């Protein structure tokens, strides 16, 4: 999310820019995501895409993309996961600690494969202690994750 189809770069190796406007995305790339949401998709992966028309930050760090577009406008209520955080689109520009905090602030629930898990966890703990991230924000993610685990039969 929000759609890698109209790009020529690979976020495994560097930054990827989506040059479409938000209206163009709504008319193209967002259509299958909306269909999935309408059909009851439980999880959406946010790709390491920079959609310049929406935000200068990569999508996993963008409150405008994760919370305002995906959750509020498109009505997604499930779990949001990042693409692999070991990919160069992320690691060339951000530490694991920065990635963790920025993604959670944007509304992401799960962080996939941070290079340095310990520093990511420490940064999140410190962000909560300092008030940079509220406990309520973490509780939202925990609730969504537990609901998905329950639905999948992973909790008894």
Language-model segments: which ranges?
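Second-shell residues forming the walls of enzyme active-site clefts
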Residues: 1-126, 132-137, 144
């Amino acid at each position: 999310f929000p759609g890698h189809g109209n790009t020529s770069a690979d976020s495994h190796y560097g930054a990827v820019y989506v040059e479409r406007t938000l209206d163009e995305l709504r008319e193209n790339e967002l259509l299958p995501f909306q269909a999935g949401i309408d059909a009851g998709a439980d999880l959406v992966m946010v790709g390491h895409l920079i959609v310049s028309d929406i935000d200068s930050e990569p999508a996993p760090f963008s409150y405008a993309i994760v919370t305002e577009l995906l959750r509020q406008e498109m009505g997604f209520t499930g779990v949001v996961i990042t693409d692999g955080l070991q990919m160069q689109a992320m690691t060339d520009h951000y530490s694991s600690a920065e990635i963790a905090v920025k993604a959670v602030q944007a509304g992401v629930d799960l962080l996939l494969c941070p290079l340095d898990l310990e520093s990511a966890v420490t940064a999140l703990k410190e962000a909560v202690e300092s008030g940079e991230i509220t406990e309520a924000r973490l509780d939202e993610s925990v609730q969504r994750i537990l609901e998905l685990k329950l639905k999948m039969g992973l909790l008894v």
